[in-house]
Amino acid sequence: MVPEARPEPTESGHVSKGEGWFVLNARDSRWYAGPGRSAFCDLEGDQDFSQLGININVLEPGVPMAMYHWEADQEDFLVLAGEALLIIEGEERPLRQWDFVHCPAKAKHTIVGAGAGPCVVLAVGARVLSVDNPDWGGYTVDEVALRHDAGVPDDTTKPEEAYSRFTKRQPTAYREGWLPD
């Protein structure tokens, strides 16, 4: 029998502390936010899921979800609300509510908030090859991504280099307006 891993309250929201099944409302979960960065809902808690990464990102207009990158595993995205701009393989694609994006392994991509208000994106990614692996993926120079402030000046595989110009996101409680009613 698989035990319940009931999320525990913290100053920045409820957090799952162990293995097991649980139910958690996104508004009650721990979030991370920082200046010029997307806010994201930490659904996994203190222990990352071993097979699948999942989170909810809230992108203000012009704010990238991530630096332009590729991963050794597939990633998928579903726009839950608002508008965004997908940059994939050096091309731009507008996204709107209920658009689904599939990025097979090695597809270079990022998503940038667009439109008049916040965009909410569900992100899901496999964790077969990318966890604790030096060949997880990388950040590559791309002119389109750079034009949207979502690119790196030099190729790197180190997240700390790709995000060096940003303030690190800090744990926070859900803020009203991040998720649609």
List each model region and its residues.
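Surface-exposed, gly/pro-biased binding rims or lids
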Residues: 126-160
